[in-house]
Swiss-Prot record:
One of its GO terms (cellular component) is cytoplasm. It is found in: Cytoplasm. This is Fructose-1,6-bisphosphatase class 1. It comes from the Bacteria. It comes from Syntrophus aciditrophicus (strain SB). Binds 2 magnesium ions per subunit. It catalyses: beta-D-fructose 1,6-bisphosphate + H2O = beta-D-fructose 6-phosphate + phosphate. Pathway: Carbohydrate biosynthesis; gluconeogenesis. HAMAP family: FBPase_class1 (MF_01855).
């Protein structure tokens, strides 16, 4: 009986390296990212035993309470990215400032959320590690620490996410598609599957925090009222988990602006999700899967020029017919 040899993630990347003229530097960078994800998953699985599930007792730059796993995941990713020696600068949700690494010899900027949905950790529910990668301009000298890293999503060459601890992760490569991998426990052997959003509206799902419906704008509330019965409703409460479902079933994930809250301090007219390491990441993956993403002005997410490294945005991401409909609504 012939032996079946599973494909390794490195084999997959090498095939694409040859086909799309990618360099070995990218392979080294991706190896550091997948190693970081493995370490995060290990700490997640053993968190209760090692006392890593509580609060860290600090507040991050977003004004959010930090959990111990947030700090652990951030430290892990920063360590492996620095060890790769291929990264110029890093923007992390958990780091107030830009993190300099190899400004002279590095080739990539990396944007990441080390532990999306960390409030799920204590309940054993899925969390995510999201990342986006942009390449240094070949003719570029560093303009300065405050602007060179501020790249549009259209400048990204890759983006991906790990859904921890499911053993599944997604990687989108520019002009080469969006791929989901089912990995073994070592994340060495993988089963790649190209993701394309389904065309059948009967499969589509609608995902958003329904508890906030009354504080959305009138336009958004009206659209929900008309369309909520057309699609199945699913909401996990972690961007990585909800977007993972979206890639499988199609439809729409949205995080609208909050503009009608009884307490004006709770309003978020600019949106909640961060552009560089959340919205751009899922927008990039969705585009490579045949979808699109916009903000609440109808502007494509990947065309937004960031003004700051923790800039927030509204987000509507999913199947193109729905996104086109919403873009027309917002621009009207």
């Amino acid at each position: 009986m012939p032996i079946e040899f599973e494909q390794t993630f490195r084999n997959f990347l090498m095939e694409h390296q040859e086909k799309y003229n990618r360099t070995y530097h990218f392979l080294i960078l991706m190896d550091s990212i997948i190693t970081a994800a493995q370490r995060i998953e290990l700490y997640y699985r053993t968190g209760a035993l090692k006392g890593n599930l509580g609060m860290a007792g600090s507040i991050n730059v977003q004004g959010e309470s930090v959990m111990k796993m947030d700090d652990i995941a951030n430290e892990i990713v920063l360590h492996y990215l620095a060890a790769s020696n291929r990264v110029i600068q890093v923007v992390s949700e958990e780091s107030d400032d830009i993190v300099d690494m190899n400004k002279d010899g590095g080739r990539y900027f990396v944007y990441f959320d080390p532990l999306d949905g960390s409030s799920n950790v204590a309940h054993g529910l899925p969390v995510g590690f999201l990342f986006g990668i942009a390449k240094r301009n070949l003719d570029g000298n560093m303009k300065g620490p405050e602007d060179f890293h501020l790249r549009e999503g259209n400048d990204y060459i890759a983006a991906g996410m790990f859904v921890i601890p499911t053993g599944m992760f997604t990687l989108a490569l520019r002009d080469a598609g969006c791929w989901r991998f089912h990995a073994d426990e070592t994340a060495t052997y993988v089963k790649p599957m190209r993701m394309t959003l389904p065309d059948d509206p009967k499969k589509w799902e609608l995902s958003f925090n329904s508890a906030n419906t009354t504080v959305f704008s009138e336009k958004v509330q009206s659209w929900i009222q008309v369309n909520i019965s057309k699609y199945k409703f699913r909401y996990i409460g972690a961007l990585a988990g909800d977007f993972h479902r979206l890639l499988t079933n199609g439809g729409l994930f949205m995080y609208p602006a909050i503009v009608k809250h009884p307490d004006p301090k709770e309003n978020r007219p600019q949106g909640k999700l961060r552009l560089l390491y959340e919205a751009n990441v899922v927008a990039f993956m969705c585009r490579e899967a045949g979808g699109d993403a916009i903000d609440e002005t109808g502007t494509r997410i990947m065309e937004i020029k960031p003004a700051g490294h923790h800039q927030r945005t509204t987000l509507y991401v999913g199947s193109k017919p729905i996104i086109d409909e919403l873009a027309s609504l917002f621009k009207s």
